[in-house]
Amino acid sequence: MSGRGGRRRGPGQDSGSGQPSPSLSRGGGSRRGRGRVPSGPPPYSSYTPPRPQVAPTQPPPPSAPSTSTAPAYHPLSSSGAESLMREVSQKLTLEPESATTAPLLPPSSSKAIRSAQRPGVGRDGEKCKVRANHFLVKFADKDLHHYDVSITPEVTSKKTNRIIMQQLTDLYKQSHLGGRCPAYDGRKGLYAAGALPFESKEFFVKIIDEDQGRGSSSSATKEWQYKVAVKLVSKPDLHYLREFLLRRHFEAPQETIQVLDVVLRAKPSENYTVVGRSFFHPDLGPKGELGNGIDYWMGYYQSLRPTQMGLSLNIDVSARSFYEPLLVTDFVTKHFKRTSLKRPLSDQDCVKLTTALKGVKVRLIHMAYAKTCKIVGISRLPISELTFTLDDKKTNVSVVQYFLEKYEIVLKHPSLPALQSGSEAKPIYLPMELCQIVEGQRYTKKLNDQQVRALLKATCKRPPDRERDIRRMVSNNNFNGEERVSEFGIHVGQELALVEARVLPAPVLKYHDTGPEKSVKPSKGAWNMINKKMVNGGEVDNWTCVNFSSNYANISNDFCTRLVEMCNNKGMVFRHTAAVPIRSAHPFRIDQTLRDVYEESTRQKRPLKLLIIILPDQSGSYGKIKRICETELGIVSQCCQPKQASKYYPQYFENLALKINVKVGGRNTVLNDAIEKTIPLVSDDPTIIFGADVTHPQPGEDSSPSIAAVVASIDWPEVTKYRGIVSAQPHREEIIQDLYKTVQDPQKGVVPSGMIRELLISFYKSTRRKPLRIIFYRDGVSEGQFSQVLLYEMDAIRKACASIQDNYMPPVTFVVVQKRHRTRLFPTDTASTDKSGNIVAGTVVDTIICHPTEFDFYLNSHAGIMGTSKPTHYHVLYDENKFTADNFQVLTNNLCYTYARCTRSVSIVPPAYYAHLVAFRARYYIEDETSDSGSANARRNARDRNVEAQPLPSIRENVKEVMFYC
């Protein structure tokens, strides 16, 4: 478990205990609204932010050019920026488009797009040394050759492909391969450190089929013959790679890097279970049980990357869930926590078991030879009622009778269904008690809460322990002793990279002038609210509380009294008496109770500004409550865990007050530099900061849409309030589809629309200023998607701006935010260590392990709590604002102290974090339609993935006006 900036209950939830967590996990999507300075009493602070004025629905084009000192938009002179702008200008269309938006297609070529070049390295902050889990890779000048491999009949399994190619190498290494030992990638690529004695050749290889004919009753060993065609394709250039690493070229030779990567992965791929870029095996570390028939295995992640120090091998320890190699009957016992299998499985259990076991390989233990089968389902009837026709096509026999007569086996569990192999047309029925799950199969389904806790407990390692395990993995792998690695002239260093880092200072945070402490400078990523008042307290006039807890049914009045008192003490204006009576209700009546409260407040003409909810004792109701409140009734809600609510801890009430304040339009704190307008570039001109994320369904949810979320700051110069928008899009589509679009209006015809346009207009309504700079933090993008995402989404941003006003093209800085990387930073001395043993908050690295030429950096902006902290990787893909390294690194670090839900700096810049929270919230709005309940929707297969996503339920307007997702 990585070090986190605070405990969390689950992404997007606003209930829980202790300090709300600033750490980030992934999931879902939703919408977000404009915050407002509350009406009523004057602000508590001598600093008063600009109040929104009455504005037209759309901002009118100004009659004269802006008097701002911001330079007019000009493309950068670098060839990278020019090439992108050529692509964008070709796609930019100012005339209205067809109302039917065509699906985005991949560009014909994105090679012309080049990421922003590094504008020098940062110098701000106190220097220190850290170690990184990167190992220097040296390589000799070799004559690399890339060959294409074609195997007939076609094989889809990489494991089988590797067995075939290993057999080919063993048979023909000396006679036909010139004594060379080529490296194979498991698919189409074969690489040699020198020419093979041919340009094109066919080989024939025989291997034993581990499935023994897939259903044949013959005990004879069965062999399969494959034809392998090998043909020369190219000669990757190591010289060009050296030139790139020396920064004499800007385009990374990916093919050459891939060759060396395949060589380093060849031996582990043959010996271990491969999952993406990671390897797992029981010998790589301790394994343990997660429960329900699932184990965890330890392993390691490995990736070869170009860095400033040269090629770097990134190694990190990892853990994954695997099926226990059990008899299927034992798996059923563990999975359903049964003590006996005498009772038949229910229909619901059968659906769950099918989901858990579909695609799993089992070994038949009653056979005299090793035979494996793949499970395609389970029978509808118990095995005692199943019959089939023998091979003579005349005799019909029961499965129970067949096993008794054929194998002299009396089945012990005839009431259980049979496992089904083969096909629907010709099923093969297998008794569960005679099938053992084959070892080494990854469990890809969603882990339950108990399993997640067990996995985190087993894998959460303090920095010294994680560093030790990484060193052990590298030593045990003995890369330099492997035949192919030596043949290719590759040498892997044994020491972690020593990197020069800097610790950026924490920003000064402004609080209310009426509090004893008017500002604070956080220490080691944390501070508290003692003697401080919120810089802008929100107003809550109409509120009430509903308690759905049975175990804590009598706490409602005392709890609300203490919560209201805390909110008022911290600077809010919170009415002491509820608008409608506080009540308790049964959790089975959530829907009706919420509607009753809404109708009662409406009848009394006291519409609720806040509904406090004490959740049921059993989990599972949170999403339902949020969906009803936000999409049906139009009520902002604050949910509380009953166990925590009953303890009356002041810290818990303080945390709730922080969340409630921003939900009703207030601000908790702002950067002092923002008030004094001393943030470089951002304070100079009206600047809007976006955060964007796309979250995808859990594995196995083939019919669920992906959800895109975009948030944007709507206050300037404070940059603390973020309005959010969400949109459903096709399953696992990464590019955000609705950043810009056109729609058909009944009166106006085709009109421009989309997320960016709506948020730009919201900024104008709130500040009466056009944004003259755009900063776009984009989360959730892998390196392979950089070019496409930049091309499409920059194009959408440009079109959205142009749709508001001709020639309106504010300069854009487009930044990818990555948490799903495997770089870890370890302190080298106690002076640069926090109490968790991690590097301190504010540690930034932009040398040695970063890209040779592009503008990227690692920032550890949060204080670790447990485990090893994971820095966030920021990669600036496009920068028309011309930030210096220091300016952008300091801005990003300082923003991490403005997260509204806690008094800790967070691990990821808040706009991206908020986008994640908004997206996760929207997942609750549709979970009833896409839940894994055995419904037709849940069983829909991959052929439905590209259908148009259904629109999300609309969030009520009054809810969208505030940061309801906090």
Annotate each PLM feature.
Residues 2-966:
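Long, low-complexity, intrinsically disordered terminal regions
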